[in-house]
């Protein structure tokens, strides 16, 4: 079928599948990052399609901070069991030994040690030369200027001023020993594209994306869900049952919920058509300091 005969979502799907297949053929030891969110779920679905009826020929890696929502971990394990993909889970052992907590140590230190350093540990441990990520250019300004094939040096750092040209969808995956490429097959998708594709393909998601009554407290202008008994409450502070959902998912102490009645995919898509705010406004790690996401990416974050 000619490209002009494909629908918008079909064109995005075809581009992403081409990228996934090209990486699988070009690199010796690729891995797909699996953060359990909606973008990861779409990327997993595309990988399954890319190699159907065979199995995905590379593992999925979850860098677990030990502070994810309980529903996310349960969903992760259910997906691995249902689809039979190889799942690698890595936790930063030094961070666990130090007892790193977003409450005691703050979002910046927690993210650096448990996410960035944990990711670099896992990539070094398994010797991966390419790693798929679910980032999209419409999410955030530093991601908007990143290539589909994002070169990382032997320290896993990113230099936005030294990126490779990608003319006519031609990608340069040449790396020396110790270097790697971060690959973003969803680069050209928007948040609305993601939701419409989830609806079209009937992709399973963590229930946290759908509105229901949940126990939350207000912190720094954000509604934080009390997911377990590790969350310290201020004197007199009591969680309230509010009808909320999550537009983006991460560590529960650093992820804000939003008031919503969208408990179906159709209602979420309708909500997305009307929204004028960024999905990442609910992520505390993006507001640590000016240009905080670009700084994290320079240091090795996805």
Swiss-Prot record:
Q: Which GO terms describe its biological process?
A: hydrogen sulfide biosynthetic process; sulfate assimilation
* Domain of life from the UniProt record: Bacteria
The protein's name in its UniProt record: Sulfate adenylyltransferase subunit 2
**What is this protein's function per UniProt?**
With CysN forms the ATP sulfurylase (ATPS) that catalyzes the adenylation of sulfate producing adenosine 5'-phosphosulfate (APS) and diphosphate, the first enzymatic step in sulfur assimilation pathway. APS synthesis involves the formation of a high-energy phosphoric-sulfuric acid anhydride bond driven by GTP hydrolysis by CysN coupled to ATP hydrolysis by CysD.
Of which family is this protein a member? Answer: Belongs to the PAPS reductase family. CysD subfamily.
List the catalysed reactions.
sulfate + ATP + H(+) = adenosine 5'-phosphosulfate + diphosphate
Record keywords: ATP-binding included?
A: yes
Broadest EC class? transferase
Record's Pfam families?
PAPS_reduct
Question: Does the keyword field hold Nucleotidyltransferase?
Answer: yes
Subunit description: Heterodimer composed of CysD, the smaller subunit, and CysN.
Q: What is its EC number?
A: 2.7.7.4
List the pathway annotation: Sulfur metabolism; hydrogen sulfide biosynthesis; sulfite from sulfate: step 1/3
What Gene3D superfamilies is this protein classified in? HUPs (3.40.50.620)
Key words, A-Z: ATP-binding, Nucleotide-binding, Nucleotidyltransferase, Transferase
Cite the SUPFAM superfamilies for this sequence: Adenine nucleotide alpha hydrolases-like
Q: Which GO terms describe its molecular function?
A: ATP binding; sulfate adenylyltransferase (ATP) activity
Q: Which organism is it from?
A: Shewanella halifaxensis (strain HAW-EB4)
- Source taxonomy lineage? Bacteria, Pseudomonadati, Pseudomonadota, Gammaproteobacteria, Alteromonadales
